[in-house]
A protein has these predicted regions:
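Phosphodiester-processing cores and adjacent nucleic acid-binding clamps
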Residues: 3-378
């Protein structure tokens, strides 16, 4: 990037940057960025790493992991989780939860992230999958955390002018995550000079306080763009997607709206938005460097059925089990035959004859294991 001082042109090396807050099409409500398009864009921008942080799920993680590795990019696997006071309580005042970004730093962190997201669905689901800070304390190892968007607990405290609570929140997360906790700056301002949206004005005010909190509490800042679609020209399609998924009309004044700036911006575009926060831009690479290379590949996980050392398969009992399976299927067909119209009876009769033939073979088969392996009905 070049700037002019009088007639003198000066070349400035832009800081390196990577996106750490990215929603793919697997963010079911509002994600419109396909994984292949994100990889293509990241390569075009010369990035070396990119993150996935879908809303409350990890459905796209394996596809993202494979695509990033194929593209020569480091996959940073994460999730934007919803945090409530008690994930087991169904409190309508907390049904949405506060947003929080979690990124897996290593394989241990990935496993802990899987546990957190699993618990959010199996124990904490109430309108949305939710966790709480008790779970975060239990499964924080190997995770990097950032304060998220305006929907995060910290930005919400700032927007409500509760700076004492904001300081308490920073200290709480710092106690849990230590140097792996970051404060997240966002600014959805158009570079073309379009008027600021309400969202952008809120972000400006929140960012001012985040700078103060970062200095006061010794926490580093990062810059993100809360990516929801890949290209700037995808904004109208993303807007239509929101309407479809929320059942609202485009002209509904009270519907969910985005700014149109939530696209996968280049490092230069992000630097232009944050000219005074070059260190926060560089800190995204600090996080990328923290993330270790690890594999998701493993052997098939088979259930373990412990058997006593003296266990012997009783061939006679095995044969009885096979025959009971055939008897059950034949009985079911006989009931269908009784209620079927005449047009269907020939096909049912043909199937029943086949089952009786196979039952007769099972009664006389020498190798029941081989017989069962070759029989799709068993």
């Amino acid at each position: 990037m070049a700037i002019f001082v009088g007639s003198l042109q000066i070349r400035i090396d832009m800081p390196q940057f990577t996106h750490l807050h990215v929603h793919t099409q697997y963010s079911i409500l509002d994600g419109a960025a396909s994984i292949p398009s994100l990889m293509k864009r990241a390569k075009e921008f010369g990035m070396t790493a990119v993150a996935i942080t879908d809303h409350g799920n990890m459905f796209g993680v394996k596809e993202f992991y494979d695509a990033a590795n194929a593209a020569g990019l480091k996959p940073i696997l994460g999730c934007e989780v919803y945090v409530v006071k008690n994930h087991r309580e169904k409190d309508k005042d907390e049904k949405a939860g506060d947003h929080l970004i979690l990124l897996a730093k290593n394989l241990k962190g990935y496993h802990n992230l899987v546990k957190l997201v699993s618990y959010s669905w199996t124990e904490g689901f109430y309108y949305k999958p939710r966790i709480d800070k008790e779970l975060l304390r239990q499964y924080h190892e190997g995770l990097i955390c950032s304060s998220a968007c305006l929907g995060g607990e910290l930005p919400q405290a700032i927007m409500h002018d509760d700076l004492e609570e904001a300081s308490r929140i920073v200290e709480e997360f710092k106690e849990i995550f230590g140097e792996d906790y970051y404060l997240e700056l966002q600014l959805h301002r158009s570079l073309s000079g379009a008027p600021d949206t309400d969202t952008c004005r809120h972000q400006v005010e929140v960012n001012k306080v985040l700078h103060d909190l970062a200095a006061r509490h010794g926490v580093k800042l990062i810059v993100t763009n809360d990516v929801h679609f890949t290209l700037e020209e995808d904004a109208p399609a993303h807007d239509h997607l929101i309407c479809l998924n929320t059942g609202r009309d485009l002209d509904d004044p009270n519907r969910m709206r985005y700014t149109g700036q939530e696209f996968f911006k280049s490092p230069d575009e992000m630097a232009a938005l944050f000219p005074d926060d070059l260190e926060a831009l560089e800190n995204t690479m600090e996080i990328a460097d923290k993330v270790e290379h690890y594999t998701l590949e493993h052997k098939p996980l088979m259930p373990d059925f412990p058997l006593p050392d003296d266990f012997v398969i009783d061939q006679a009992e095995l044969r009885r089990i096979f025959l009971r399976r055939f008897d059950g299927q034949i009985s079911g067909l006989e009931k269908k035959m009784a209620d079927a119209d005449e047009a269907k009876k020939p096909s049912l009769l043909h199937e029943m004859e086949g089952l009786r033939t196979e039952k007769a073979q099972a009664e006389t088969a020498d190798d029941l294991d081989a017989f069962a392996a070759g029989n799709e009905r068993l």
